[in-house]
Design a protein with these regions (language model features):
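Alpha/beta enzyme core
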Residues: 3-14, 26-52, 57-76, 85-173
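Short catalytic-loop micro-motif centered on adjacent basic/acidic residues
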Residues: 19-23, 81-82, 103
Length: 173
């Protein structure tokens, strides 16, 4: 059952339990995560990077695969399909493809541009019943061949982005 991530995380907060996000890269990983979540009776967030989406021939393919597997495997636990660290353009592709949650990584933009793009995406996502995460500062690590040092987010900038109505905030620490 595909749901937006905010709904499941609100229930988790009220019930005092955690929800895992697992990035998927192919059919086998997706099947393993879905079956394990079902076996454990645990909601789950399936994260998809832009690189993984490209590898799996596009976000529409990913969305169709997850929806078909959810149905054919008889998954009854809540499942969110979430774009992980997406570009502005990637967010729109995932919205069109049927994802239930997006993450806009505007951390590389000046704060004014990050705010403008995040504001627009919050309006579109919420208008369609999707959850949205935004980033301030940069999270260190390597993904899709890009290595980031990480950068501490300015607390005032975090508040500015949070006040836009995002459902989750990723703050570089």
């Amino acid at each position: 059952m595909l749901v937006n991530a905010k709904e499941m995380l609100d229930k988790a907060r009220a019930g005092k339990y955690a929800v895992g996000q697992f990035n998927i890269n192919n059919l086998e990983w997706t099947k393993a995560v879905l079956l394990t979540a079902q076996e454990l009776n645990s909601p789950v967030i399936l994260g998809v990077s832009e690189g993984a989406g490209k590898y799996m021939t596009g976000f529409e393919t990913v969305s169709a695969m997850v929806a078909a597997m959810d149905k054919s495997l008889g998954i009854t636990v809540p499942v969110a399909l979430h774009l992980d660290h997406g570009t502005y353009e990637g967010c729109y592709k995932c919205i069109k493809a049927g994802f239930t949650s997006i993450m806009f990584d505007g951390s590389h933009f000046a704060i004014d541009e990050n705010i403008a793009k995040t504001t627009e995406l919050v309006s579109v996502a919420h208008g369609l019943g999707l959850s949205i995460e935004a980033e301030v500062g940069s999270i260190g690590g390597e993904e899709d061949g890009v290595i980031g040092r990480g950068e501490c987010a300015d607390p005032d900038e975090c508040k500015m982005i949070a006040d836009l109505g995002v459902d989750f905030l990723a703050a570089g620490i």
